[in-house]
């Protein structure tokens, strides 16, 4: 699977250094996944997954800028930036999350639609969020929310989360029929994939 990014250079961002019943799935421990202590971000930072590529470069600007290219997302940093400053770390992390969310908005909905069609599990709409507390959720009306942090997962775990949420369009709880449905789409590996997802760690 290749990342989908605009062919043209994205506009530059300057960052200042200053109803229905809802099933809320913490699909398998995103909060636990984020308990890993975050390492400082600097010019050596890279994200390279099948769906998302991002790196930092030094530039001659007086502010940070984010550019989308055919190769991925490039964050251009001021030449004399001090990465040890907490405000710089917050700024860069926010820029990365913003870029990741934009990429997720282009990447995840077509993938969800393809899986929906393949397994005959229609949904009403999909929304990409910046949620740090759950991978996804599905409402009783078939509206699905997906976290942009899914872009950091390997493809088989990304598919698992999407299939998990699509399963809720038919089975609104985590009872036996839910797991039978999810097993039917994952080769009987639903619980194994859940366990693998719970063990997924990242430095970011």
Regions flagged by a language model, labelled:
Residues 1-159, 169-204:
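Active-site-proximal or metal-binding-adjacent scaffold patches in catalytic folds
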Residues 162:
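Walker B beta-strand of ABC/ABC-like P-loop ATPase nucleotide-binding domains
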Residues 165:
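Walker B catalytic acidic pair
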């Amino acid at each position: 699977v290749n990342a989908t990014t605009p062919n043209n250079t994205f506009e530059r961002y300057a960052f200042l250094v200053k109803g229905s019943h809802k099933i809320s799935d913490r699909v398998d421990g995103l909060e636990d996944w984020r308990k890993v202590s975050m390492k400082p971000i600097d010019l050596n930072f890279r994200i390279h997954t099948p769906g998302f590529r991002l790196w930092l470069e030094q530039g001659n600007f007086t502010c940070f800028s984010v550019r989308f290219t055919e190769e991925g997302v490039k964050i251009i940093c001021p030449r004399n930036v001090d990465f040890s400053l907490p405000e710089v770390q917050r700024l860069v992390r926010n820029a990365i999350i913003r870029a990741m969310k934009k990429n997720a908005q282009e990447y995840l909905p077509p993938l969800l639609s393809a899986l929906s069609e393949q397994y005959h599990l229609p949904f009403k709409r999909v929304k990409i969020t910046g949620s740090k507390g759950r991978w996804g959720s599905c409402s009783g009306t078939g509206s699905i929310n997906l976290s942009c942090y899914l872009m950091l997962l390997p493809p088989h775990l990304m598919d698992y989360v999407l299939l998990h949420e699509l399963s809720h369009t038919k089975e609104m709880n985590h009872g036996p029929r839910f797991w039978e449905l999810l097993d039917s789409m994952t080769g009987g590996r639903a619980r194994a994939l859940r366990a693998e997802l719970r063990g997924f760690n990242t430095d970011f």
